[in-house]
Swiss-Prot record:
InterPro entries reported for this sequence: P-loop_NTPase (IPR027417), RapZ-like (IPR005337), RapZ-like_N (IPR053930), RapZ_C (IPR053931)
Name of this protein: Nucleotide-binding protein FN1089
Source taxonomy: Bacteria, Fusobacteriati, Fusobacteriota, Fusobacteriia, Fusobacteriales
Residues at which GTP binds: 56-59
Organism name: Fusobacterium nucleatum subsp. nucleatum (strain ATCC 25586 / DSM 15643 / BCRC 10681 / CIP 101130 / JCM 8532 / KCTC 2640 / LMG 13131 / VPI 4355)
One GO MF term: molecular adaptor activity
Length: 290
């Protein structure tokens, strides 16, 4: 029996691939870390239905080997997803300093090793179904992201062209570095300064009504949705499998949350876009900022 679902976990050394595999193991996936390339057939022959396989730069000599591995699995017809784990260079530097472990590329400096690996793995990042930046993500939030992604994939059409992650954030806490497209909605009047709305958030009807009724909001959204309905098919044509759209306001509680939820719903129901998988996250809520 062929495996029902194989998840390939790859990415930058020190970014958290082992943590990712541990989370998937807790989600009932049988995990294999650092699988040598060339054992593709054994993955397909096993009767295990849910497999998560860790592959990193130690495993392959060049990205061509990785793509050969991936294409072999794809051609078998087995359902497969690629999750790419990354983090900011400063975070990876700090993690290596604490662990006192050597980077697998062993360049003159640790930073050079990190930057070289980032460059080598860029083509793999581009075809990933899910890209996660662990710079500011706690393990609990990482688990939530995985669950959202996998639950969405379980009910999807097998002809899905692209996975679209739409996230809200607050600029006061820093910008999300995994963004492909970023929109700043701080030009819209802030509900935070209205006493009865201050403690509410973008899920509350009063906040949604206030934000979306603003003249600036209407004009912005009138342009935003058609722009994305144009851009997304272009990304699909270029072979992009994952797109992260970030919308930010001051605290990531009112305006950005409202727009993310509305945009996600409208993209799902778009008559222009077909076979897309849309899922949402609200960074500041997940980090406990509201």
């Amino acid at each position: 029996m062929k495996t029902k679902h194989i998840i390939i976990v790859t990415g930058l050394s020190g970014a958290g691939k082992t943590t990712a595999l541990n989370i998937l193991e807790d989600m009932s996936y049988y995990t294999i870390d650092n699988l040598p390339l060339g054992l593709e057939k054994s993955l397909l022959d096993t009767e295990i239905e849910k497999l998560a396989v860790g592959i990193d730069i130690r495993t392959f000599k060049n990205t061509k080997d990785f793509f050969t591995f991936i294409n072999y699995i794809k051609e078998s017809g087995v359902k497969m997803d690629i999750i790419f784990i990354e983090a900011h260079e400063a975070i990876i530097l700090g993690r290596y300093t604490l662990s006192r472990r050597a980077h697998p590329l062993k360049e003159v400096t640790l930073l050079r090793s990190i930057l070289k690996e980032k460059k080598i793995l860029f083509p793999i990042r581009e075809i990933a179904d899910l890209v996660i930046d662990t710079t500011e993500i706690k393990t609990v939030e990482l688990e939530k992201r995985f669950k959202k992604f996998i639950l969405a994939k379980d009910g999807e059409n097998t002809d899905i062209n692209i996975n679209i992650h739409i996230q809200s954030f607050g600029y006061k806490y820093g910008i999300p570095t995994d963004s492909d497209l970023m929109f700043d909605v701080r030009f819209i009047p802030n509900p935070y300064y209205i006493e009865k709305l201050k403690e509410l958030n973008g899920f509350d009807e009063e906040v949604k009504e206030y934000v979306l009724s603003q003249k600036e909001s209407k004009e912005f959204y009138f342009k935003l949705l058609p722009l994305l309905e144009f851009l997304i098919p272009q990304y699909i044509k270029e072979g992009k499998k994952h797109l992260t759209i970030s919308i930010g306001c001051s605290g990531g509680q009112h305006r950005s949350v409202t727009f993310v939820n509305k945009l996600a719903e409208d993209l799902k129901n778009s008559k222009v876009l077909e076979y897309i998988n849309v899922y949402v996250s609200h960074r500041e809520k997940e980090l406990g900022h509201w």
